[in-house]
Amino acid sequence: MIVHRIIPSRVKDPLTRFKPLKNLTTSSSPVFEPSSSSSSSSSSASFSVSDSFLVEKICFSLKQGNNNVRNHLIRLNPLAVVEVLYRCRNDLTLGQRFVDQLGFHFPNFKHTSLSLSAMIHILVRSGRLSDAQSCLLRMIRRSGVSRLEIVNSLDSTFSNCGSNDSVFDLLIRTYVQARKLREAHEAFTLLRSKGFTVSIDACNALIGSLVRIGWVELAWGVYQEISRSGVGINVYTLNIMVNALCKDGKMEKVGTFLSQVQEKGVYPDIVTYNTLISAYSSKGLMEEAFELMNAMPGKGFSPGVYTYNTVINGLCKHGKYERAKEVFAEMLRSGLSPDSTTYRSLLMEACKKGDVVETEKVFSDMRSRDVVPDLVCFSSMMSLFTRSGNLDKALMYFNSVKEAGLIPDNVIYTILIQGYCRKGMISVAMNLRNEMLQQGCAMDVVTYNTILHGLCKRKMLGEADKLFNEMTERALFPDSYTLTILIDGHCKLGNLQNAMELFQKMKEKRIRLDVVTYNTLLDGFGKVGDIDTAKEIWADMVSKEILPTPISYSILVNALCSKGHLAEAFRVWDEMISKNIKPTVMICNSMIKGYCRSGNASDGESFLEKMISEGFVPDCISYNTLIYGFVREENMSKAFGLVKKMEEEQGGLVPDVFTYNSILHGFCRQNQMKEAEVVLRKMIERGVNPDRSTYTCMINGFVSQDNLTEAFRIHDEMLQRGFSPDDKF
């Protein structure tokens, strides 16, 4: 009889005074020695007269139920074990008695593959599948024992033990359960080469596991061998192979496969439909998914909760939220009750859209139907409110986690900590972190990174360094993001030496360096004007085959232009163009700044006009940079012309406070205070609020003309607008 399922034996051991075979497997002492050449040959090859006499004595003692059998077992060797079991082939009670007594008296007996195989056959025939599997596991885990030796041993003892093919089913299942799938496949191939038949249930276990870990080609090889062997497949086989096609992205072959198996009398069931609907939904092929779903009733199947959940999730993931709500309503009309998975999909999509009203509506509906939200639902809600800055609501949902009988995990805590860090409430974030640890919830790298980012943003580098040291002491390995956060923090404070030390630490620890890390360092050294180090960092990045991004080029070009290295900036520009990287508005503005700082505002204007002709759309900074450049060159007519061009030609670009301040500065420097006064009034009329720099410039202009009356008038206006003068006044 073919055994389809491994279950603990219900057969009672006739000798209850003996310990069961599990004693053989629980011993921690080594019980095997390397297999000798005799272990894979016939037991009679080196079977002596004394061994034969010993076997007779053991068999006689077993039949008589004598207690002195132990005295005989002490002289036993593996070949004699095999011979005893051969003699017991027609009396399984004696065979079991022998196996149990051997295990009880000599748990460390040095078995060979042959002796274990004979025991396995007897135990399988006796229905003691759990004990047989224990013996198989011992054989499988033996060092230096190949699949060929195991299969040969089972084969050579097969007939003499009166065994059946269910032994080989058990072998395949044991490999699968031990997660030794490559070995299971090899054993299956060997068994088929010897003409043994493996049941479809064991084959399903093998191909199902192969598909699950992505070894689809091996699974198809087993399936084809099953088909050749004439073993009848069943609907489980069908579903496994349909899943294999879906997993391999070969959806177009499903129809042909189903036609082939239906010719064999095997037809799809509801699992088949759900598998295909899930595959189509995950790829966003929703029309195909709906077509299958609508076809189900005609085949005698009703879409269930799993079916609806799959479709709703697919619609949500591919941005079709309104359609997902329609399917949800249809689900309710069909009498099905949504579960937490249903609501999770809707909540996550509503949260992603940032729709607070809709999200709360879905959550409220969920609670009204007595569906308990899971941690993912709560984390989605909390994430929505922390992103929008509504920490009170986020905290309310955090407390609801506990009220629902759930234990907040590190994801839940990290979301709330991140919200407080964004608000600059570091002390509250740290209190939450302490609560998290007290609750036995371990911090991971993401949690540390979140707090580190908050500390660095608040320029609390000392605290950040302490937290980083704590992280490493807890044996948590920082990732590239961790160190990039710290590098950025030190760069922003001008601690470039500390930043470089962290960068070197990344290299020493072989932490993956990415373009973000390099960009951070480039920006830090570029802003302090250390062009040589910036170029060294660039060269190091390129040598490691890390491709610069448009941001990388923008940082380097800006650094070069800020120092007036226009020729080098153009070399970088040309390299960027040669790599088909389209210049960004930031890069163009940097080039314009380079011209202006070199005293060539006219060339900067020509550059801007050329870029506009090539489709570049300038922004306020583009014009402001040029206007300031012409003001520095005391070319006020050009500066005014650009303001007019900015307003009229570009449509939508409105002069801002920097634009007006640049013009004011030019007039004040030339002692043209009437013109400066006109610009100030026009600025206010157009709704552009002057800033402290505006008033300071005007006051200094009047003071330079010894016009203290006007200077004090502007000073009073400045105070009325809430600005305080600086120390220079």
UniProtKB/Swiss-Prot annotation:
Family matches, as Pfam families: PPR, PPR_1, PPR_2
PROSITE patterns for the chain: PPR (PS51375)
NCBIfam families the UniProt entry points to: PPR (TIGR00756)
UniProt keywords, alphabetically: Repeat
Positions of PPR repeats: 112-147, 164-198, 199-233, 234-268, 269-303, 304-338, 339-373, 374-408, 409-443, 444-478, 479-513, 514-548, 549-583, 584-618, 619-649, 656-690, 691-725
Biased composition (Low complexity): 27-45
Organism: Arabidopsis thaliana
InterPro entries recorded: Mito_RNA-Proc/Resp, Pentatricopeptide_rpt, TPR-like_helical_dom_sf
This protein's record includes keyword Nucleotide-binding: no
Name of the featured protein: Pentatricopeptide repeat-containing protein At5g01110
Family: Belongs to the PPR family. P subfamily.
Region (Disordered): 26-45
